[in-house]
Amino acid sequence: MNMSNDSSDLNKDLIAFLKGSVSKYHAVSQIVNILSNKGFSLLREDQEWNLKRGGKYFVVRNNSSVIGFINGERSLQDTGVKIIGAHTDSPSLTLKPNPITYSSGYSQLGVEVYGGALLKPWFDRDLSVAGRIVFKNSTGDIGEKLIDFERPICVIPSLAIHLNRDANGNSPINPQTDILPILSQNIEGQKPLDEMYFNSEISDKFLKKGEILLDHDLNLYDVQPPSMVGFNEEFISSQRLDNL
């Protein structure tokens, strides 16, 4: 059984969107690009709007939410309003402001559960980090950038079955202790990966000379890309699918 060309193209577009939406900020950035390419114009909330009938517009707030709309050709009383809504964010594990912690010879990331997340699927995955950073440039201006390490930099390993005999049962997961990803092994005689080193890696990879990292809003994501599954490739398997 083969899908129609229209369905195939739609699935490819959806998969590309899901793959690129590694954080809410990346999702909004993609939506803005889609709307702009479709002829929508950006409206700024600090400016007066001059809306035209039939005009296509969008508004972005905090770079984490976006509203696009088409102004009707006729009066609102005649046409009414049609609204479609979706999330730009998804349940995830978000890095704490000072995320580096240590345990049993490892540097780990301190994370908080964001939203109604299923925790078991996060174990034994190749995890990367993405989101938004805020920085100050050489002239003192504040800016922001979207970042994505684009490679697995941490993992939340499961305990071996002989250390947790109830692993296949109703073994509870403590979000404060059981889902801290391992980031690096601390070798005796060498300085462990600490907060300063982690921030310097972000600065070296994503900031220009003279730019100073001030803050971040980052989350983990599984680097495995979305895919079509099933004997006839009739299903889409992807994280974030039910939100975006």
Model-predicted segments: where are they?
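N-terminal hydrophobic/helix-forming segments and targeting peptides
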Residues: 1-244
